């Protein structure tokens, strides 16, 4: 009908230009490692072992963006009762608290040729939606100063310079509370 969205249209809307967002599975490891290496300098990139542990320990908070069968981006993070991310959380998956109040974002990666097409936004929105549906209080992340404004568009608030010295960079603590 005119101006009425059918169920088929809505479903296609989630796909948008052939790109889908889904929960990661262990078989995604190789592709995820490649995306991480392409998106972050070596000092900041999570290594294969860390990414494998994250896939194993918190698959429910590890989402991938796929174009056809190609993984082009992902978002992941542990769940915690802390309101900020400590550097130890990046390395130690035992700090994941499945019933925790806050969904952290350890990484939001999109390969270069797919940037500026809304893929990162869709990954973030999917993670926010998942955190909300799981009854979390909100989400937390750390970012560099140039990305503060970007994350504010999702409702995150800047809490100032983080204690994190991950990769030798200056990070800012951001929080989104429901």
Locate each region found by the language model.
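Hydrophobic adenine-recognition pocket in adenosine-nucleotide-binding enzymes
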Residues: 24, 108-110
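C-terminal "cap" of GNAT-fold acetyltransferases
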Residues: 137, 144-145, 164-178
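Short, low-complexity, charge-dense intrinsically disordered segments
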Residues: 7-16, 128
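Conserved acyl-donor/pantetheine-binding loop and adjacent beta-alpha core of acyl/acetyltransferases
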Residues: 74-108, 115, 125, 165-171
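Conserved acetyl-CoA-binding loop of GNAT-fold acetyltransferases
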Residues: 152-162
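A short beta-loop-alpha structural element at the N-terminal edge
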Residues: 19-32
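Active-site rim helix/loop that mediates acceptor-substrate recognition in acyltransferases
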Residues: 42-68, 76-95
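Conserved GNAT acetyl-CoA-binding A-motif
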Residues: 124, 131-143
């Amino acid at each position: 009908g005119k101006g009425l969205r059918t169920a088929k249209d809505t479903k296609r809307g989630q796909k948008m230009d052939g790109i889908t967002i889904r929960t990661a599975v262990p078989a995604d490891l190789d592709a995820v490692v490649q995306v991480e290496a392409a998106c972050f300098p070596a000092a900041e990139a999570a290594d294969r072992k860390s990414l494998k542990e994250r896939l194993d320990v918190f698959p429910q908070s590890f989402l991938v963006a796929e174009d056809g069968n190609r993984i082009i981006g992902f978002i992941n993070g542990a769940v915690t009762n802390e309101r900020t991310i400590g550097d130890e959380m990046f390395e130690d998956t035992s700090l994941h608290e499945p019933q925790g109040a806050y969904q952290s974002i350890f990484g939001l990666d999109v390969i270069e040729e797919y940037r500026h097409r809304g893929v990162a936004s869709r990954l973030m929105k999917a993670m926010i939606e998942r955190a909300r549906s799981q009854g979390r209080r909100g989400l937390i992340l750390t970012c560099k100063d140039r990305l503060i404004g970007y994350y504010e568009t999702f409702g995150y608030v800047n809490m100032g310079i983080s204690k994190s010295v991950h990769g030798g960079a200056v990070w800012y603590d951001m929080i989104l509370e429901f």
